[in-house]
Each structure stands twice: as C-alpha cells, then as structure tokens.
Amino acid sequence: MPQRDSKDLKVLLVEDFEDTRLFMRLELEDQGFIVFEAEDGKVAVDTAIREHPDVILMDLTLPLMDGFAATKLIRQNEQLRNVPIIAVTAHHEDDFRSDAKASGFDAYVTKPIDVNWLKELIAGLLI
C-alpha cells in the first residue's frame, strides 16, 4: 500500500492545555497535516465522529472525559474502529502504558514530542 503524504492527512489533536495544543497544531500544520482540535474527551469523540480523521493524537489526562474513556468510545464506532490513536502524554509510568494498550491505543509517546519523529510514527501506523 503506498504511503500517503502528510499534506492530505487529517489529524485530530486532543489536548487540554491551550499552549501545548497551539504549539502542536502549528508544528503539525508545518508538516502538512490538516489539524482538528479538541480540548476534552467528550469534544474529541464528537469531533472524531464528525470529521473522520486519519489519525488521533490523544492526551490521557483530560477534563470531562479522559483519553482512555474517549478512546474506548471511538473504538465502538464502526467507521472509526481502525483509525490509529496515539497516546500523547507526560506520563512515563508503565501503568499508564498498559492502561492505554488495554483501552485501544495503537501507540504511546511521551512529551515533549519531536514532530518529525511523530510524522514517521504516523506514517508507520497508516501503512
């Protein structure tokens, strides 16, 4: 399967800290991604259903609904079931990694994020 160019890929960025969200959005857009944003898990689920992203970058610790619960709900949606979801978090603990895997995340990365490396990870998940 040919690898898609990042310029036509839709990314849902789920991050509750506005400064971090802005920084990541700008970095991703510089890489050519089309970025949609959500500041909590509830908005993330609604946005995923509406926009059908190619990949989701999900913080774990979020208001209203955490990233674990949001991911489980997204995985229940037939059209979104196979969308790669990457946990993007400051948590380095093994418990968070295991919980993320059990919740349906495809990958787990810790902040700070190298956006070039993240682009390669996304490409690998979409093959």
What spans do the regions from the language model cover?
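Active-site beta3 strand of CheY-like receiver
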Residues: 51-57, 62
